Regions:
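N-terminal non-globular leader segments, chiefly Sec-dependent signal peptides
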Residues: 1-64
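Short, compact, well-ordered microdomains
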Residues: 75-102
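Short alpha-helix capping/helix-loop boundary micro-motifs
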Residues: 63-75
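Intrinsically disordered, low-complexity segments enriched in small/polar residues
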Residues: 24, 38, 71-73, 96
Length: 102
């Protein structure tokens, strides 16, 4: 199977889609990305994965595999404490001590 088909299969069957929402630093709340994460992860692990994949370390985070950027413009800041992740119908906020259900 070619890479595009495999990636699409994974996103449809093997992975869940979570939304990353920027709320911190006085931002107007908005969805910045959808991140595909393994279905077998715990919800807080899905939040961790989405957080990690929306951090710019060696490259712009929106270029990471499994990330679909949803922002307007040329770029977006990295996900930080105070931002939120929506997993299914449950919203989590990134606190200094981990993930808390909102």
């Amino acid at each position: 199977m070619n890479k595009a088909l495999t990636d699409n299969y994974d996103k449809m069957v093997v992975k869940d889609k979570v939304a990353v929402l920027h709320f911190a630093f006085g931002d107007t709340p908005h969805t910045v990305a959808f991140v595909h994460v393994d279905k077998g992860l715990l919800e807080t692990e899905k939040c961790d994965k989405a957080f990690m994949l929306t951090k710019s370390i060696d490259n712009a985070w929106w270029k990471n595999d499994d990330v679909t950027p949803m922002f307007d413009g040329d770029g977006s800041r990295s996900t930080s404490v105070g931002d939120k992740v929506l997993v299914g119908n449950t919203k989590y906020v990134c606190s200094p001590y981990g993930w808390e259900i909102v």
